[in-house]
C-alpha cells in the first residue's frame, strides 16, 4: 500500500479518536453503518457536549472577569480623597417663584420693583434674610426680566445655606444676561456648598474674568486645588479605561482569529476525511483475493485484494458512481462483500442476490475496462 495513504488513514483514525463527532457527519454515514455491520460500535458524538461545556466555562470566566473589572473600577473611583469641609446636605424645598417672563411690564411696575429691591437690600443688611427673600420675590414678580434681582436673591439663598435654590436663581439670571458676573459668582459659591468642586471652580473663574471680585477670587483659590485633583484623577481613570478597552479589543480580535483558524482546521479535517473516503486506503478489510469464483470477467482473475485499490486509476470515478455508493452503504451488501473477500469460494452463496451481483458486475465492468 502507498505509505502516503497509510499516513492519511492513520491521521484520520487519530482525528476520529479525538473527536468521534466526525463519524456522525452525513458524509461518514456509510462508514458508521459498515463498522456497525461488522459488529463494531461507533462512539457517541461528544464534540457538541464539550462545546457546550466550553461555552459555559467561557461564560463563567467572562462573568468572573467582569466582576473583577467592576471591583477594579470601583476601587479606582473610591481611592480619590477630597477634603469636603464645609460641604452641606442639599436643600429640597419646592422651587421658588420666578415671575411671569411673558408679562407686560409697565413703568410703574419697574419703579415699584426698584423700591422692593431697595427694601430687600436694607433687610439683608439688617440680617433679616427671610424678609429679604420675600421682598426680592415681590420685586421679581413685578419685573421678572431683570437679571440682577435673581442674582441678589441667590446671594440670600447662599447665606441661608440653600444652594439648590441659589443655583435655580442664578441659572435664570444667566439666561437673561449671560455677561453678568454676579450670577456666576453666587452659583459658584452654591456649588462649593454642595461639594461640586469643578463646577464651583468654573463659575468662580468666569465671574472673575467678567468682573474681578476679591471675594470670588478668594473662594476660587480655595476650590481650585480640589477641582484640579478631581480632573487629574479623572484623566488617570480615563487613561486606564482606554488602555483596558484597547487591550480588550486586541483580545477580542485574537480570539476571533483563533476561532476562525479553528473553524478552518475543522473544515480542512472534514474535507480530508471526505477525500479519504473517496480513496479509502486499504479498501475493504480482508482485501479481495484474486481468482474470484464465478468470475469478475475482464479483471484477469486477479484482483489482489482491495488493499491495492487505493492506488488504482479510476477508483474515484468508481466511488462517485451513485449505484456503487448506494450498494456500499447497504449493510447486507457490505457483509456479503466482506464474506467473499475473506473466502472467495463463498461467492456461490450470493449468486441469487441481485444487489450483491449487481455491485460485482459494476466493479467487473469498471476494472475490466482498465486492464
From Swiss-Prot:
Q: What keywords appear on the UniProt entry?
A: Acetylation, Chaperone, Cytoplasm, Phosphoprotein, Repeat, TPR repeat
* Residues recorded as bearing Phosphoserine in the entry: 348
Q: Where are the TPR repeats?
A: 113-146, 147-180, 181-214
Residues found modified as N6-acetyllysine:
355, 362
- Recorded GO CC terms: cytosol
Role this protein plays? One HIP oligomer binds the ATPase domains of at least two HSC70 molecules dependent on activation of the HSC70 ATPase by HSP40. Stabilizes the ADP state of HSC70 that has a high affinity for substrate protein. Through its own chaperone activity, it may contribute to the interaction of HSC70 with various target proteins.
Q: What is this protein called?
A: Hsc70-interacting protein
Name the species this protein comes from: Mus musculus (Mouse)
Amino acid at each position: 500500500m502507498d505509505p502516503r495513504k497509510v499516513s492519511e488513514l492513520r491521521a484520520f483514525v487519530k482525528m476520529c479518536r479525538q473527536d468521534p463527532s466526525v463519524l456522525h457527519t452525513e458524509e461518514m454515514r456509510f462508514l458508521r453503518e459498515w463498522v456497525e455491520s461488522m459488529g463494531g460500535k461507533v462512539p457517541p458524538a461528544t464534540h457538541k457536549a464539550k462545546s457546550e461545556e466550553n461555552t459555559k466555562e467561557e461564560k463563567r470566566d467572562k462573568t468572573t472577569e467582569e466582576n473583577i473589572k467592576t471591583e477594579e473600577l470601583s476601587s479606582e473611583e473610591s481611592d480619590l480623597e477630597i477634603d469636603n469641609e464645609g460641604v452641606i446636605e442639599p436643600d429640597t424645598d419646592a422651587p421658588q417663584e420666578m415671575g411671569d417672563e411673558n408679562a407686560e411690564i409697565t413703568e410703574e411696575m419697574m419703579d415699584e420693583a426698584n423700591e422692593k429691591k431697595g427694601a430687600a437690600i436694607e433687610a439683608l443688611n439688617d440680617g433679616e434674610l427671610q424678609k429679604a427673600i420675600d421682598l426680592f420675590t415681590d420685586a421679581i414678580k413685578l419685573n421678572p426680566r431683570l437679571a440682577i434681582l435673581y442674582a441678589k436673591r441667590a446671594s440670600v439663598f447662599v447665606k441661608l445655606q440653600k444652594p439648590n435654590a441659589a443655583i435655580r436663581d442664578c441659572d435664570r439670571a444667566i439666561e437673561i444676561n449671560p455677561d453678568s458676573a454676579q450670577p456666576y459668582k453666587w452659583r459658584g459659591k452654591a456649588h462649593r456648598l454642595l461639594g461640586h468642586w469643578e463646577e464651583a471652580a468654573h463659575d468662580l473663574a468666569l465671574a472673575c474674568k467678567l468682573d474681578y471680585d476679591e471675594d470670588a477670587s478668594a473662594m476660587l483659590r480655595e476650590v481650585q486645588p480640589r477641582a484640579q485633583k478631581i480632573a487629574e484623577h479623572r484623566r488617570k481613570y480615563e487613561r486606564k479605561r482606554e488602555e483596558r478597552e484597547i487591550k480588550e479589543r486586541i483580545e477580542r480580535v485574537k480570539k476571533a482569529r483563533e476561532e476562525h483558524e479553528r473553524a478552518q482546521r475543522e473544515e480542512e479535517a472534514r474535507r480530508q476525511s471526505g477525500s479519504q473516503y473517496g480513496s479509502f486506503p486499504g479498501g475493504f478489510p480482508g482485501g479481495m483475493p484474486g481468482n474470484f469464483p464465478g468470475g469478475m470477467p475482464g479483471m484477469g482473475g486477479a484482483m489482489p485484494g482491495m488493499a491495492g485499490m487505493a492506488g488504482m486509476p479510476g477508483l474515484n470515478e468508481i466511488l462517485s458512481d451513485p449505484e456503487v455508493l448506494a450498494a456500499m452503504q447497504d449493510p447486507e451488501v457490505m457483509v456479503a462483500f466482506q464474506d467473499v473477500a475473506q473466502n472467495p469460494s463463498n461467492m456461490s452463496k450470493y449468486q441469487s442476490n441481485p444487489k450483491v451481483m449487481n455491485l460485482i458486475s459494476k466493479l467487473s465492468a469498471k476494472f475490466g475496462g482498465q486492464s
